[in-house]
Amino acid sequence: MDLDQLDLNPRITAAVKRGRLKSVKEILCYSGPDLQRLTGLPSHDVQCLLRAASLHLRGSRVLSALHLFQQKESFPEQHQRLSLGCPVLDQFLGGGLPLEGITGLAGCSSAGKTQLALQLCLAVQFPRQYGGLEAGAVYICTEDAFPSKRLWQLIAQQRRLRTDAPEELIEKIRFSNHIFIEHAADVDTLLECVSKKVPILLSRGMARLVVVDSIAAPFRCEFHLQASAIRAKLLLSLGATLRRLSSTFRSPVLCINQVTDMVEDQQSVSRSLGASEERLSPALGITWANQLLMRLMVDRTHEDDVTTGLPRSPVRTLRVLFAPHLPLSSCCYTVSGEGIRGMPGTQSY
């Protein structure tokens, strides 16, 4: 940066140039006494020089976090999200999944975890103006076979689910051609997959979403209690690799997790009867929780109709357990042949 741009007495500027200092940043690399020796300026002139250089680099004023947030239109890449394919759920999650970081999705069986993951695998293929990233997805199965039948059902219903996108656009997307499926039944295979195979797809732009279904299965079946230290070390290694991939390629990572019952005393259990979801905790403990940017949890409960006494359709709820940009909140949703839809007016904060 040119020294003539500094608001200084010409005498000070000339002395700086005689000292062979060529930039403002170079000036700030020296202490006051060193600048005095290089330029021959007195102490008060050197202080004026340092102050002018600091003000020039700092800019006109200090920017607060609120100001940067309000300028998000000027930095669209930093605020981009991956849509879930449902406007209600997108609004609930502040636009969708963050592009950088690991999102954990935990919940009991039949709550809709895999359904949501499959819906994201389709949503990521849409153009950016429709919440997608115009790329495919990597789906890593660790316990069950890939649900291809359900995937084809969702593909066939995309025109009914994604009413925001033109039908011509949906017809052009070859959804099934851009979902890359891997099976990893043990920890070593999973680590090899995310460290060698997945980076190739991400670096070539063929995929921009990574799904692991589920993260807990290989760790829970391979390690006993005495091997908890080894398990923690491997979990940290896996988390670091997934975070690095997400940050390098700006691709969201969704890790589906199982749940375990929390151990409580008899008094606590008796108080929480009828609220079983409050006694469930995501598996793998604090070691894995520290790897996540955002943790979501889904649950599925049955309620009886007050008038008839017959069981109603199951009530499913998506909850935000922690996230740096979202409050603790919940939203109800339904699972149908078309996919997952949020229920308007059910958000609670």
Curated annotation (Swiss-Prot):
Principal place of residence: nucleus
Pfam families: Rad51
InterPro entries: DNA_recomb/repair_Rad51_C, DNA_recomb/repair_RecA-like, P-loop_NTPase, RecA_ATP-bd, XRCC3-like_C
PROSITE patterns the record matches: RECA_2
Record keyword Nucleotide-binding present: yes
Signal sequence extent: none
Assembly: Interacts with RAD51C and RAD51. Part of the CX3 complex consisting of RAD51C and XRCC3; the complex has a ring-like structure arranged into a flat disc around a central channel; CX3 can interact with RAD51 in vitro. Forms a complex with FANCD2, BRCA2 and phosphorylated FANCG. Interacts with SWSAP1 and ZSWIM7; involved in homologous recombination repair. Interacts directly with PALB2 which may serve as a scaffold for a HR complex containing PALB2, BRCA2, RAD51C, RAD51 and XRCC3.
Name of protein: DNA repair protein XRCC3
Organism: Mus musculus
Lineage, broadest ranks: Eukaryota, Metazoa, Chordata, Craniata, Vertebrata
